[in-house]
Amino acid sequence: MKFSEAWLRTWVDPDISRETLVERLTLAGLEVESTEPVAAPFKGVKAARIVAVEPHPSAPRLQVCQVDIGSGSLLTVVCGAPNARAGLWAPLAIIGAQLPAGIRIELAKLQGVESFGMLCSAAELGLAEQSAGLLELPEGDFPGVDLHEFLQFDDISIEVDLTPNRSDCLSVAGIAREVGVLTQSPVTEPAIEPVTAQIGDIFPVTVTAPAACPRYLGRVLRGVNPQTQTPWWLRERLRRSGIRSLGLVVDVTNYVMLELGQPMHAFDLERLKGGIQVRYGQADEALTLLDGTHLRLDEETLIIADQQRALALAGIMGGEESGINNQTRHLFLESAFFNPSVIAGRARFYGLHTDSSHRFERGVDPELPRRAMERATALLLEIAGGQAGPVIEVADSSQLPPQATIILRKARIHRVLGVEIAESRITEQLTRLGLKVERIEEGWEVKVPSFRFDLALEVDLIEELGRLYGYDRLPSTRPVGQIQPVLKTEAGAFIDRIRQVLVDRDYQEAITYSFVDQELQQLLDPEGSPLVLNNPISTDMAVMRTTLWTGLVQALQYNSYRQQERIRFFEYGLTFNGQLADLKQERTIAGLISGASYPEQWGLVGRPADFFDLKGDVEAILSLVGEQRNCFEFMAASHPALHPGQSAQILREGQAVGWLGALHPWLESKLDLSSRAYLFSLQLEAVERGSLPVFQSLSKFPAIRRDIAFLVNANIPVQVVFDCLKGCESDILKEFQLFDVYTGKGIDPDKKSLALKLILQHPSYTLTDDRVNIFIERVMALLVTELGAIIRE
């Protein structure tokens, strides 16, 4: 919400400085995001009156103006603006003036005529991006007044960053109400009286969706002068609030929206057919908006229509075919209350965000439409003339938001805030906020006004009191109570162990959104069944994640673009598959590595991370299940998002529980990644089912190492060799490990040489050579029989 300090002070004018006002707003929860001067710095510019205008003797596009700045004599100024005319008040930069663009005004001779200054446009003063002629000023009492004083440029624009629940402050009226409470200052509202109907013209209104639009007001205005310029004061208040002037009618509706908080819309009455209908759209119904956007509507979009076509997106933006222009003389004014739940998300669904939708989706006071209608009508008739018809109102009170009644207990206030607030002050502050307060035995019975959608519970009122008392003034009191140890479930403790394992391996935990980009997720998990959100935060957060990889890959992109060369992320969270009726939520642990295998150091030659680095990290997680680690195996398999030659499926007792591998090269190219990325994903439930450790005393007898080298077919995975060894049941085989793989010279092309290290040890006695040799011969025979191995000497 952006507004000018001067406008606010016409409503409430506390005796505090500008800096204090900004600070008080921020401390009260209305965070001031920025303040800026309402005009660019310039000096030497006066409010001047053009007395006479004559054609330039030798330049047909120029005029010679005689200008009065109250100095006793007229100044000759050469000007090329088309709107320069006698009687016009305009800004004059005198000799020596400094303009915002760094321009210094000097005595100049234009086509033989000396010019003693420059008449200025709004653009030349930094008040607009572009302008076609001189800035036309309101008539003053005396020419020659400094323009800063003449136009009250000693002002600032204040922009407040409001939280979504404070829609009541999306207006000058709402901000003024807050300032009045904070400073105990009176609030002076403009007098808004009902406008008496001068004509009997009405335009029928039908509301077929009362739950979506419980209140709709319309009014016919005839004979409005379309050539009337928006008054300077109104244009300036809009500009200082960040809104461009777009013509009188639009300016007035925007002004009322900023002043009172009620978005309005004006239709060209002569372009409407039959009557207004407030209804839901029809499938594939067409609508062209005021900004030229062509839409195909759906059946969940609330629209304003006539008997022939859709006219506007309700609460969002009007349509081109019914919009007003500089020839419009007859208007139909709309002022309505739309249910926030109906408007929320529709603007984003169509890729739109307007001041109107911003307010309606947060909640507009349902009692405000009539007041806004009268205010807009009065302004239009006062400025542009015309005649107003009666107000037509269609309302369903049963569909309006109920006004909550809350019991506020004094003891509860003290217990939550830790400070005693005088009863009289509580009553005064709540009343100033617009709440109806009645004293009862235990505290107060408070009736919430229609404009406060955020007040529903007792704690909401206590929060208001704390906010107005001042969060900075609340005492800091340590809680007193018994400290109880936090009891974690086995599942909670297990994920903490996984976290610790990964952190020890130099990973960082990431927490990403559960809402993800549908296109990216389709690339990473094309077989998933994502749940599409009806009301997405944005178009790139439109579906629920079916895999954690989507968020991790986006995090990789973000960090890569910021020159992070070594990235190791993991995330624990839920994935969502299916639709609402059969939605499957699954706890998942996933990780991603990219860049160097280990941090740069002097003692090791750097190398990029590879598939086996990631596999080692996954094996470290699987080792947490104890003896049941042997239930897991890695099988080469194909995944659409992974490199076809560097991907594996993780199985537990034959059932798929996860994936790991390198990101597909095509995806790396599409995502513009600078280095190869490796990912894993694992169902947490699969690794939670482990066995408790069983104590085994260490053998005091020596361990013996034996190495076996053999040839097998090149297409046999090492995992098959390991499975073969696991089948060799023995009480002396403590450990086996692959320590060499060789292909090339001296080996048949269809073979590979593997070398295994076997560690043998018995818990009760020293192994003899005979016992060891018998076991080794048994292992070699098993390899030959099961795998067709050729033992190497």
Curated annotation (Swiss-Prot):
Entry-linked SUPFAM superfamilies: Anticodon-binding domain of PheRS (SSF54991), Class II aaRS and biotin synthetases (SSF55681), Nucleic acid-binding proteins (SSF50249), PheT/TilS domain (SSF56037), Putative DNA-binding domain (SSF46955)
Binding sites annotated in the UniProt record for Mg(2+): D454, D460, E463, E464
GO molecular function, one term: ATP binding
Binding note for cofactor: Binds 2 magnesium ions per tetramer.
Name this polypeptide is given: Phenylalanine--tRNA ligase beta subunit
Keywords: Aminoacyl-tRNA synthetase, ATP-binding, Cytoplasm, Ligase, Magnesium, Metal-binding, Nucleotide-binding, Protein biosynthesis, RNA-binding, tRNA-binding
One cellular component (GO) term of this entry: phenylalanine-tRNA ligase complex
Compartments where found: Cytoplasm
Top-rank taxon: Bacteria
Oligomer and partners: Tetramer of two alpha and two beta subunits.
Keyword S-adenosyl-L-methionine: no
Chain ranges of the tRNA-binding domain: 39-148
Requisite cofactors: Mg(2+)
